[in-house]
Regions:
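Feature captures outer-membrane beta-barrel proteins of Gram-negative bacteria and organelles
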Residues: 157, 186-199, 219-233, 368-382, ...
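Sequence/structural signature of outer-membrane beta-barrel proteins
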Residues: 171-179, 208-214, 242-248, 357-363, ...
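Short Pro-Gly-centered beta-turn/loop motif in secreted/extracellular proteins
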Residues: 78-87, 311-317, 703-729, 741, ...
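Post-signal-peptide, soluble extracytosolic/periplasmic N-terminal scaffold domains
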Residues: 2-12, 16-271, 581, 586-661
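Structural motif
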Residues: 43-45, 58-64, 152-157, 276-284, ...
């Protein structure tokens, strides 16, 4: 078919490219009239036509960018022509090249935006792979910066665009009670989370409104703060209302200023504890490190002693199996035991937090006392981490010191001690101390995980900062309860999990106990959970027990047991539908049984569930409850509704949620915004799914939002090309972004909106346009196409009428066109054009 013939040129180019090591010569006479006026020398030497190509930029085989690159025709020392890419010094720096070490890169580039001289880097090469649309950059390892796992180069961090953004959610519920006194209750709830982004600054707020029954509605602000990243310090500065970090002391709500390290800005291997692998290589050797069967490190070392310090372990435990492959074919193998300490940092890594402000309790009647806090953690040699901190407030001072370390195969351990000096409102000054021990061990071979934490309160006067400050109130009321005045003497928590494989399932045990100093007895909490897969379904058993100490010394014990089973019905229904059954049996109250069917429809945009439950101890007829739930994941937000009915009551509810971004292009509505956000821009391509998120599609302009991006890391935002409108094409389906914390970054897709046409071109004298001539649509960037052997060219993104420019060698001509009234085969216009 004729409209496929333009592919001939790409085929010829591909053959030449793949065989450019050999001397091939194309017989121009085989092209007939199309050969007139065309120079075949470039094709004979395996070189493409110079111009702009959209390519994936590959550095040593790894894709680092996708962009339009200008290629110029140059000749090497032997006079052989080749296409040289125009890459700027700043672009090379973004790709990880140590541009500061090669000042000759600037020889041709007088400014950072001009083409750099890549030959300044010894043994560096750039090759255009036209078949795969790739620019292959081969850069010596010494000329590249060290790349770390879990973080992108700082040059790629993007603070995003100025924007106003807001999440909103609302729900209203109507409940009709039918038993005893009939009545109707209405409740409504609204939450707004507005924010502003300006440069690196992020301003955030959370405000809610609630009304229940006959009460009037009430607004309440949860927090307002401004923060930004200080990238040179790898830290964040926060001003306003927030909560402190809880690694050393308990988290404290405050209004003030906080400067703290941001782990997300630091490579995992530099901040997290990692073992040092030491050995001796007899020759130039390759060292391979495996953990849990996976290769986590591979490098080449020189003869002599070596120490590998930048390992990124894939799990929190698991021995490291090291193999040294010598150049003479011999190998060395040894094992390095490894466990992650409860608190552990990489050697030399410093983590800190500084806070000053006022205490911010959720109870508005609590005094806003001045507080200050400082914490410090530092990675020491010998697999140790030292940490400590101080807290100071009106009526309260505390200090803490601790040490964490690895015990090899025996697990990991950290121990810390704290001392407090405090005075509750209306009470005498108290002084106390506590010790905390944390132990963990993970046995990968048996699938066993064990964690234990033990607090020992050495004296009666130990209090936390919140214990003391919450007692000071300006309303004259003293919140006193007998439980608040109980003094714990110790507290223990443990967790044990055991995996027995796919068929036997997983078992988890949890437990905690609190012993009291001034009253006999203790509080206990235990839990057991087991789950497995059966024939594509799931089965789980859960048991929990809580024993709480009462004022008279007695205990109240509550047990609850539940059994849950789910089975997919897709083999019968042909879609994603499951049935479930659940039984819940508490020690107080009757047993409840529930059956349900749930599923998805419309490409996972619709979630639905139908449930029927029965409670044994309910009044006659009142134990049966029927419920229906529907949720729609739309391009402009989420919409849900539910309905439940029993003889005792009937309830209906509706909820909506979504996100709004106001930016320099306008307003974009979408699903709720989470974390850092990509503003997807595909002009003219409406209704196109983005990524794997149900319901996330471009709006009528081609815009949408995608949240939950990984900060300071490369994220790929993808369009589904199979869902593009008939008149739309994209030059690439993936865009890579590296957002900073809370940023709104642009993910721009280059679209061509318009008709597709196969045009036969002729010159004024009736002769054919030479083979390989370049055709561009005036006013359309990146629209170059090539003429085939039949003087035909395939064009996309055409308006109803316009102008084309045709170039070959030193000659050119122009074509004015107008689309025919009707499309041809496969929606393709077929027409002719006269080139003048």
């Amino acid at each position: 078919m004729k409209f496929k013939q333009p592919a001939l040129l790409l085929f010829i180019a591909g053959v030449v490219h793949c065989a450019n090591a050999h001397a091939y010569t194309f017989d121009a006479s085989m092209l007939g009239d199309a050969a007139k006026g065309v120079d075949m020398s470039l094709f004979n030497q395996g070189v493409q036509q110079p111009g702009t190509y959209r390519v994936d930029v590959m550095v040593n085989g790894k894709r680092v960018d996708t962009r339009d690159v200008v290629f110029k025709l140059e000749k090497d020392g032997q006079g052989t022509p080749f296409l040289a890419p125009c890459l700027t010094v700043s672009q090379l720096s973004r790709y990880g090249v140590k541009t500061e070490d090669y000042p000759q890169l600037w020889k041709a580039a007088k400014t950072p935006d001009e083409c750099a001289d890549l030959t300044a880097i010894p043994q560096a090469k750039a090759v255009l792979d036209i078949n795969n649309q790739q620019l292959q950059l081969s850069i010596p390892q010494l000329a590249l910066r060290t790349k770390f796992k879990g973080i992108a180069p700082e040059d790629l961090w993007d603070d995003g665009i100025p924007a106003f953004l807001m999440n909103y959610s609302a729900r209203t519920t109507q409940t009709d009670y039918k038993m005893d006194m009939e009545r109707r209750d209405n409740s409504s709830w609204v939450q707004l989370q507005p924010g502003i982004n300006i440069g690196a600054w992020r301003v955030r707020n959370a405000t809610s409104w609630q009304r229940s029954g006959q009460q009037s509605g009430k607004w309440q602000a949860a927090y307002t703060y401004a923060e930004r990243g200080l990238y040179s310090l790898k830290s964040r500065l926060t001003l306003g209302q927030k909560t402190s970090q809880g690694e050393i002391f308990d988290s404290v709500p405050f209004t003030g200023v906080m400067l703290a390290s941001d782990d997300n800005m630091v490579p995992y291997s530099e901040r997290q504890f990692a073992p040092v692998v030491r050995g001796i290589a007899r020759t130039q050797a390759r060292v391979e490190v495996k953990q849990n069967g996976y290769t986590i490190y591979n490098t080449t070392v020189a003869p002599g002693p070596f120490a590998l310090r930048d390992l990124s372990v894939t799990d929190s435990s698991g021995d490291l199996h090291v193999t040294v492959w010598e150049a003479d074919g011999s190998t060395q193998m040894f094992v390095v035991p490894y466990q992650t300490p409860a608190i552990a940092l990489h050697q030399g890594y410093l983590k800190y937090s500084l806070l000053a402000g006022r205490y911010r309790s959720s109870d508005s009647a609590t005094d806003k006392a001045q507080i200050a806090q400082a914490t410090l953690m530092y990675g020491l040699p010998w697999n140790l981490t030292a940490y400590g901190g101080i807290q100071s407030a009106t009526h309260y001072q505390a200090a803490l010191l601790g040490l964490g370390g690895s015990l090899g195969r025996w697990g990991s351990l950290s121990v810390d001690g704290s001392d407090t000096h405090s005075q509750r409102q209306g009470e005498a000054v108290q002084q106390g101390a506590s010790w905390r021990l944390r132990y963990s061990n993970q046995l990968t071979a048996t699938g066993t995980n064990f964690f234990l934490t033990r607090w020992q309160y050495a004296s009666q006067g130990y209090n936390t900062l919140s214990d003391v400050l919450d007692s000071y109130r300006h309303d004259g009321n003293r919140l006193w309860s007998w439980r608040e005045n109980l003094q714990p003497s110790s507290r223990t928590t443990l967790m044990l999990s055991q995996s027995w494989g796919r068929h036997l399932g997983n078992l988890s045990l949890t437990g905690s106990r609190t012993d009291w100093r001034n009253r006999p007895g203790h509080d206990d909490s235990y839990g057991l959970s087991w789950g497995t897969s059966i024939g594509g379904g799931s089965l789980s058993l859960n048991w929990n027990q809580n024993r709480t100490l009462w004022r008279n010394g007695a205990h109240r014990k509550e047990n609850i047991t539940s059994l849950w089973f789910s089975m997919p019905l897709s083999r019968w229904t042909g879609n994603n539908v499951s049935a479930s059954w659940q039984m819940t049996s508490p020690s107080h109250g009757g047993q409840t049984q529930q059956v349900g069917v749930n599923g998805e429809a419309f490409s996972q945009q619709l979630d639905w569930e139908v449930r029927q439950s029965y409670r044994a101890d309910a009044p006659p007829g009142g134990g049966n409850n029927s419920a229906l739930h529907l949720a729609w994941n739309g391009a402009y937000g989420l919409l849900g509704g539910d309905y439940s009915y029993s003889r005792a009551m009937r309830q209906m509810g509706v909820n909506i949620a979504g996100g709004i971004v106001i930016h320099h292009h306008g307003v974009t509505l979408g699903q709720p915004l989470q974390g850092s956000v990509a503003l997807v821009e595909a002009p003219g391509a409406s209704g196109v799914p983005v990524g794997d998120w149900p319901g996330v599609k471009t709006d009528f302009r081609g815009d949408t939002t995608v949240g939950n991006l990984s900060v300071y890391q490369e994220n790929t935002v993808s369009l589904d090309p199979s869902q593009l409108p008939d008149d739309a094409e994209v030059t690439q389906t993936d865009v890579r972004v590296v957002p900073t914390e809370g940023a709104v970054v642009e993910a721009k897709f280059h679209t061509r909106i318009g008709a597709r046409a196969l045009m036969t071109l002729k010159r004024e004298d009736g002769s054919a346009i030479p083979f390989g001539a370049q055709v561009t649509v005036n006013g359309q960037d990146g629209s170059a196409a090539l003429v085939d052997t039949d003087s035909q060219v395939y064009l996309t993104g055409l308006a109803d009428k316009g102008e084309l420019t045709v170039k070959w060698g030193a000659q050119q001509c122009r074509v004015n066109y107008q689309l025919p009234a009707h499309k041809g085969i496969a929606g393709l216009y077929q027409m002719s054009g006269l080139c003048r």
